[in-house]
A protein has these predicted regions:
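PP2C/PPM-type serine/threonine phosphatase catalytic domain
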Residues: 1-264
Length: 264
């Protein structure tokens, strides 16, 4: 399968700096979104460090996919490599925060998608999400690592409208905050015509899953889809930096989504 992608990031309507970073590479099949945090531009450093660390590690693996040291989780070499790339990013960001006072306490989310052969590996830390759009459905492939999401998982019958949770956006997991981090890693078999979205919470805090889905189904070039998503988030208030990366998969022959998105 071939992939076609686009990405866009925007500072939003309320922030002075953009602390989001992203990366797309259709040749490698690698897509990354990171949302940094920390004062004095430290968030920008954290997110860009996550992106560069994951990118460098995965490019090396893609060029020469050597066997990866693994535990007993039965992950594929590709999934293990993605996991290791995030662990590397965590060590680099954490060490920077320890070595430079202005970076103390900085951290970042990470959302990574990697297409290796017929397997799509997705991984995340924090609340940057990955969605799968398949035909008429949209599915969140990742779980948010926030106080709010954790409360929902522990209390599945709780009505989120019944009471507010203080600091519900506080992350319970982030890259670079501690010496070690655990990423959620998933593997799936994608289908031709699948479309995948990676995004920061600046998008998902402003738009519902259904609004994101409708923005994708409206079609156009992939660049238009990214811009539509970002513009919609800004129109809703743009309270945070907004980043959207989209890519879709197809066989060599041109199918429905090729016509919808008018890829090259």
């Amino acid at each position: 399968m071939k992939t076609f992608s686009a990405g866009r990031t925007d500072v939003g309507r309320k922030r002075e700096n953009n602390e989001d970073s992203f990366h797309t590479d259709d040749q490698v099949g690698l897509y990354i979104v990171a949302d940094g945090m920390g004062g004095h531009r430290a968030g920008e450093v954290a997110s860009s460090t996550v992106v560069s660390s994951v990118k460098d590690y995965m490019e090396a693996f893609h060029t020469s996919p050597v066997a990866q040291e693994t535990d007993e989780s039965n992950m594929s070499p590709a999934a293990t490599a993605v996991c290791h790339s995030i662990e590397l990013a965590n060590r680099v960001v954490y060490q920077l925060s320890q070595d430079q006072g202005s970076y103390k306490g900085m951290g970042s989310t990470a959302a990574v998608a990697y297409l290796h052969g017929d397997t799509l590996v997705t991984a995340n830390v924090g609340d940057s999400r990955i969605y799968l759009v398949r035909e008429d459905n949209i599915e969140q492939l990742t779980q948010d690592h926030t106080l709010f999401a954790e409360h929902i998982r522990k209390n599945p019958n709780w009505d989120p409208n019944s009471a507010s949770i203080p600091m519900k956006h506080i992350l319970v997991r982030a890259v670079g905050i501690h010496e070690a981090v655990e990423a959620d890693v998933y593997e799936m078999q994608p289908l031709p015509g699948d479309l995948v979205i990676l995004c920061s919470d600046g998008l998902t805090d402003m738009l519902s899953d259904d609004e994101i889905h409708q923005a994708v189904l409206a079609g156009g070039e992939l660049e238009e889809v990214c811009s539509r998503l970002v513009d919609m988030a800004n129109e809703k208030g743009g309270l945070d930096n907004v980043t959207a990366v989209v890519f879709f998969l197809q066989k060599e022959e041109k199918g429905l989504l090729h016509k919808l998105f008018g890829s090259k």
